Amino acid sequence: MSKKLHLISLGCTKNLVDSEVMLGRLKSYEITPLIEKADVIIVNTCGFIEAAKQESLSVLFEALERRKKGAILVASGCLSERYHEELLREIPEIDIITGVGDYDKIDQMVRERQGFHSGEVFLASEEQERVITGSSVHAYVKLSEGCNQTCSFCAIPQFKGKLHSRTLESTLKEVKNLIAKGFTDFSFIAQDTSSYLRDRGEKEGLIQLIGALDSLEGIKSARILYLYPSTASAKLIQAIQKSQVVQNYFDMPLQHIAESMLKRMKRGANQKKHKELLERMRQVPHSFVRTTLILGHPGESEEEFEELCRFLEEFRFDRVNLFAYSDEEGTSAHKMEGKLDKRVINARLKRLDKIIQKQHRALLKEMVGQEIPVILEGGSSEHEFFYSARDARWAPEIDGEILINETLLPQPAPGHYWAKITQVAGKQLLATLTRRWEK
């Protein structure tokens, strides 16, 4: 009887790629959705901000409580890297504690029941066989690890190190391997994608990647996430606009827009550049612009917050992620004066969220009546008689779901189609599948 594996991947999609590498190394195990049935339980942790750290610890304690006798519990990922010694000391019941450097050795660690902690940062390549999760159409591809930026609030460079890009050849080989397995839609990710290949002497590595993707057989759509304002360029926006494969999808975390706040946050670019990039993105036909904002950074004044509110109402992003400032040890912001009361931060979050939700409802209503390219993932997990799809521009999960409640095509398989948006139901769109999307 084969042994059973239960894996929980917390945090970002970059972490998910590493989880998929571990699944590839342990493919002889049968995956079980039940912790109690598992012989091996892996929690791939997140240690980015306080809320993520607390979630990781909570999941680890729950796994310890529910595991069967003799089951091996593994804690891997960012929390394990950042707080390796503390976890060893405080939770000795965890059998294997490993960080962000040895995902490809998980089979050996489980076999020997011993954690490795190499101190290096693992970067998945075409040489690792991943088990892609959640889709038979879409796969994430990680371009680099680490980050050369020095944002005041961010602890990631402490445990992920400096930028380390994989070669263009390596990236393309992995994409080709995934195409051969039937994947046709891709999301390219990194801490700072617009710095891709800069550590290898190439200033516009993403533009090279986009050109190469356009010449690949079998790829139908792709998008690039996590552009950084100081390294994104007008040339890059133009390359995305011209691409036949890469969608007009622009995900660029701003964190703030007030000039003084951008400087305090050490964002590396001024307000003028931020606004110029955003305007160029918005001028691209059918563009989809997403961002992330941090509220309550030390020193954020009422005037700076009001400026952010005004800008948000004027620009109208397609999607916005909001975060409350997390005071992380080891960051320059941690030492700053002017820390804000949590009640003030929460009030600001609530006000901005109200603006965002109002805009989101309006944007969904504007899509009604349009026929758009969509990616059909299969049956909806929430609605038994509906199919689950998304706008071809959208990234999985974070940008939303389109429910297909009617189809002009009999028993459509997962893949690329056209759909007509018929109505808004709550925060979701309903649509009719009309025809295949032939590239």
UniProtKB/Swiss-Prot annotation:
Q: Name one Pfam family in it.
A: TRAM_2
Q: List, separated by semicolons, the cofactors it needs.
A: [4Fe-4S] cluster
The chain positions of domain Radical SAM core read 133-362
EC number(s) given by UniProt:
2.8.4.4
Question: Mind listing the UniProt keywords for this protein, alphabetically?
Answer: 4Fe-4S, Cytoplasm, Iron, Iron-sulfur, Metal-binding, S-adenosyl-L-methionine, Transferase
Q: Where is the MTTase N-terminal domain?
A: 3-115
- Classify the main location: cytoplasm
* Cysteines joined through disulfide linkages: none
Q: Where does [4Fe-4S] cluster 2 bind?
A: C147, C151, C154
Give the record's GO CC terms.
cytosol
| Entries under SUPFAM superfamilies matching the protein | Radical SAM enzymes (SSF102114)
* Residues annotated to bind [4Fe-4S] cluster 1: C12, C46, C78
Q: Which reaction does it catalyse?
A: L-aspartate(89)-[ribosomal protein uS12]-hydrogen + (sulfur carrier)-SH + AH2 + 2 S-adenosyl-L-methionine = 3-methylsulfanyl-L-aspartate(89)-[ribosomal protein uS12]-hydrogen + (sulfur carrier)-H + 5'-deoxyadenosine + L-methionine + A + S-adenosyl-L-homocysteine + 2 H(+)
Q: What does this protein do?
A: Catalyzes the methylthiolation of an aspartic acid residue of ribosomal protein uS12.
Question: Mind telling me which NCBIfam families this protein's record contains?
Answer: 30S ribosomal protein S12 methylthiotransferase RimO, MiaB/RimO family radical SAM methylthiotransferase
What is the protein name given in its UniProt record? Ribosomal protein uS12 methylthiotransferase RimO
Q: Which organism is it from?
A: Wolinella succinogenes (strain ATCC 29543 / DSM 1740 / CCUG 13145 / JCM 31913 / LMG 7466 / NCTC 11488 / FDC 602W)
Q: Which gene holds the coding sequence for this protein?
A: rimO
